[in-house]
């Protein structure tokens, strides 16, 4: 069993297999949906490139290890069981903007001149919120989570708020000059909207001709929690990490918790923030499985995760060939 888990955690072959399965599932989803085209395949390419960048970004931020590729593997696995993201949509833009913002925030640790970084990071959050307006509700908590970086004070908080507001000032100025102010009303309606989407569902056969529809949002939450909770417990109990590394991980955990709570209160956030959640849980969750100490319980947990993933992947394929 230890050899199996070592292969999954440390082998680049495991990452390549996960990436190829993910690409295959998404290409099939694009063809099956009939929404193919340049944008859909560009979307696929962006997710592939982004997955390749996760490892190097984590290593530069001192939150990852060069000895493991598991965070990248988990990212591709999370994408593979969510083929509804294959079609080009706003979530792709939000993913790039939000994770770029997180990386800028990770450079502010004890920074005496962090105002520029806070402004730039939250300007990206502001742009992302133009695509997903209800993200604005999470901004105060995102700012507070930056307190783990020991650089949050009155001036940096003001810089963060200004960063969020500047994209709106530019956008509304353009709308005013082009006589498209009616779009502001559409933005406000989206900001104040409740649950206004039809969640994708996974249909599980429970009998002859009968199926049980499980919302993909529930499946994603279970998958994310199974990854994140053990890692968070280990992170809390372990004192071996560097101080800066722990600060960055605390901020990431705070942001992930903010997204979880936000999605529970405003489920419509799930549509655009789902890929961000996949990325954060992959980044945080891998830490539980890379400990030097051998643990049969950890090995069983990892293999259980992979079995569940294969089951979900298989049900997705079965759903594609079945009619209801």
Regions found by a protein language model. Give the residues of each.
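Membrane-interface alpha helices of multi-pass inner-membrane proteins
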Residues: 117-131, 260-263
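Membrane-embedded helix bundles of polyisoprenyl
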Residues: 68-83, 95-99, 121
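N-terminal membrane topogenic signal
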Residues: 1-20, 64, 297-301
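Juxtamembrane membrane-water interface segments that cap and precede transmembrane helices
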Residues: 23-31, 186-218, 228-232
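Membrane-water interface signatures at transmembrane helix termini and the short loops
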Residues: 228-296
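Perimembrane helix-loop-helix junctions
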Residues: 138-162
């Amino acid at each position: 069993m230890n050899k199996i888990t070592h292969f999954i955690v440390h082998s680049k072959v495991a990452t390549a297999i996960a990436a190829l399965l993910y690409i295959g599932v998404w290409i099939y989803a694009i063809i099956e949906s009939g929404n193919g085209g340049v944008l859909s395949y560009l979307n696929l390419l962006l997710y592939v490139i982004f997955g390749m960048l996760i490892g190097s970004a984590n290593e530069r931020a001192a939150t990852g290890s060069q000895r493991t590729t598991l965070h990248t593997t988990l990212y591709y696995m999370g994408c593979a069981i969510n083929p509804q993201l294959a079609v080009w949509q706003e979530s792709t833009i939000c993913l790039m903007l939000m994770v770029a913002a997180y990386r800028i925030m990770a450079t502010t640790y004890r920074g005496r001149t962090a105002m520029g970084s806070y402004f730039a990071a939250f300007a990206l959050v502001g742009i992302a919120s133009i695509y997903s307006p209800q993200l604005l509700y999470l901004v105060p908590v995102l700012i507070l989570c930056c307190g783990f970086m020991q650089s949050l004070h009155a001036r940096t908080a003001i810089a963060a708020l200004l960063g969020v507001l500047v994209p709106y000032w530019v956008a509304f100025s353009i709308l005013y000059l082009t006589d498209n102010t009616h779009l502001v009303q559409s933005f406000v309606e989206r900001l104040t909207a409740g649950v206004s989407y039809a969640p994708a569902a996974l249909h599980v056969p429970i009998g002859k001709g009968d199926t049980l529809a499980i919302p993909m949002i529930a499946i994603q939450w279970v998958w994310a929690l199974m990854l994140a909770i053990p890692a968070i417990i280990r992170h809390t109990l372990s004192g071996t990490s560097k101080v800066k590394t722990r600060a960055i991980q605390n901020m990431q955990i705070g942001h992930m918790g903010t997204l979880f709570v936000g999605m529970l209160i405003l489920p419509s956030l799930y549509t655009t923030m789902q890929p961000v959640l996949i990325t954060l849980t992959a980044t945080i969750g891998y830490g539980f499985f890379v400990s030097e100490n051998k643990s049969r319980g950890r090995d069983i947990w990892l293999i259980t995760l992979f079995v569940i993933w294969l089951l979900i992947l298989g049900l997705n394929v079965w759903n594609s060939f079945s009619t209801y």
